[in-house]
Each structure stands twice: as C-alpha cells, then as structure tokens.
Amino acid sequence: MGNRKLPFGYQMRMGEIVRNEPEANTVQDIFLQYTLGASLKEIAEQMSKTGPSYDEGKSWNKNMVARILENAKYIGADSYPRLVDINLFEAAAEKRQTKQ
C-alpha cells in the first residue's frame, strides 16, 4: 500500500482536512463521467493518462474509481469538506446499484 492516508481529493493543512484542488476536480470529473455513462475501467484508463496520480507509483484501476464513487466523505460525511453535490453522488450510487 502507498502513502495515501486521506481519501483522494483531500490533504492536511495546519492540522485540518482541506480540499486538494487538482484532486478534488478529478473527483468531480469521475462522478460526472460515470453518471454520463463511462465505465469504471474507461474512467481508470482516462485518469491514468491525464489525471493526477491516485497513489504514488500506482496506476489508476477500476477498484480505485469504485472506491471514490462509494465514499460518502465526498458529500461531507465525517466532517470532511464536500467535494461532490449530493444529487451527483446519489445518481452515481443509483447507477452502481442497477449495474449489480
């Protein structure tokens, strides 16, 4: 396992969890791409080519994308700053349920 302690999209600054803007933008893009019909694999491939690194020395894969789509911290759970609109999060969750 790499060095990532916080979910992708966040960083610690002066003892506080804050947005990591480049990663936060990527998180929003992942949710948008997924709700518009892209597969987990397609998103992972795109992120490997153009997105910031998920974890040092690791390429993106569909499991990393799935973990992002399932993580309620992105809508502000557990006192994390919200990165994704709740409607977008719920649309992605609904799509994931219909695929199972």
Where does each model-flagged region fall?
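Conserved catalytic breakage-reunion loop centered on the nucleophilic residue
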Residues: M1-Q100
